[in-house]
Amino acid sequence: MNDAQPYMLKNGMCLTNEEDIAIFELLLDQQPHCNVNYLWNDIGLGNLFAECFSGTHRFCVDNQKWYIYNRGIWKVDKGDIQAQGNMQRLLQLLHLYCTEVNADAETIKNYKTYISKSSSDTILRRALNASKNNLVINLTDFDSDPYLLNCRNGVYDMREQKFRFATPEDYFTLSVTCDYPTGINVRQCDRWYSFVDEIMEGDKEKAAFLQRALGYSLLGVNREECMFLAYGRTRSGKGTLFNTIAKVLGMGTDNGYGGSINSSLVCESKFKDKDYNAPEPMLADTVGIRYLTLSETKKGALLDVNAIKSLTGRDPRKTRQLHCPAFTFTPQFTMWLSTNFLPKVNDDTLFKSDRLWVIEFNKHFDGDDRDYSLKEIFEHPDNQAVILKWLLDGYKMYVADGLNPPSCVKEATARYARINDRILCFKEDCLEDAPGERISNGLLYSKYKEWCEDEERGYNPVGSTTFYTEMERFYKRSRSHSIGYFNGVRLKIDAE
């Protein structure tokens, strides 16, 4: 900033930069040439640097990077270029300080010699390194208030539903890509509203739920402990919708609330580490992310229910950046999986605990239905602010009504649960009701294992105890001569 009143020095020079003037006045106040807090060595210079730049510099111990504050956001100082430049800037201001301060000539002469020697690259780096302890911050200290949303022109407080200006103490490293929409007329982007109506096929309840769910995803805490699965064939509008939301929330920039990650995070794999307490590097880049999209799952993929429960359940997780120490953080994000193929699930507690909600996208755009101008329309800065307002309105709807899934979402989720209820599927494929008949436990379980291990299915069968407990949903059990039976059932002829 260069709008400060010029500061005239005794030697005739003039300081015009506001930050330079503030630092220079601090030097005059602190008198570093005779202050025991700023000894004439690397540590003393480091302490002085920390004092002068305490409002704009932090060193993060978790990723070993400097962060510099500028206009509402803390940004990583790549290669320490700005931090080193500001150390040199401090030395230049110290030279000017020597011409301004009242002190005996011999002391100032020696102090100027010390300053000149400190300008060498080696001493400069050592002094900068010494300053770190006074400017330390943890990665989890950034973007830590889940109810503050940083915009280009200020901060939206989601608790108070009020807008204010940002301060360095907010410790934002993330921001949406547009201004907070003050006084915007929603008719300014009719196309967004008509687009949502089209992809929801005029279903007002489903469209309202979609808006509530996406507005809820602006929060930096997954209070509902759930994720969302958007399911539908290609050209259903899913990609345009979620890419637009991601763009508004800053995905693809270095400092956005939107992020993406490989769906292997929530899918089973024989190569996957099952120790959920082990550091997981994949998660390191999700710290602070609120809206997290997962890459589309492959056909036949199996969801890792334990991973989903941990990630949605706000369990502390360990992660680390490359060549950096591990640290613990609590995921803030809400996950969105958009897919053409429903992944398999082998644990129905995922559904019983309402960890997942399915939103079906049944519209198919083809031929004349396709609007190739949508991307360009929605990426216009004015329209992005309108879309942000739509998201904030969705959040307000969530605050007023909760997620409150409509019947269409509950039914879609129930259908998904049903096709993944393998015990029920086995029953429907292989068994039929037969009053007066019975099947022994051993025979029934062996048929179940055969059914699971069929090449077309490739399921891992549950243990016998779990199987018998699940089968009691359908048939009563009895014992005769130490043999257990299920009553009122027989194998279908083609299953024998």
Locate predicted features:
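Modules that initiate DNA replication and primer synthesis
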Residues: M1-F24, Q64-Y97, E428
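Feature primarily recognizes SF3-like P-loop helicase cores of small DNA viruses
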Residues: M13-K65, H95-E496
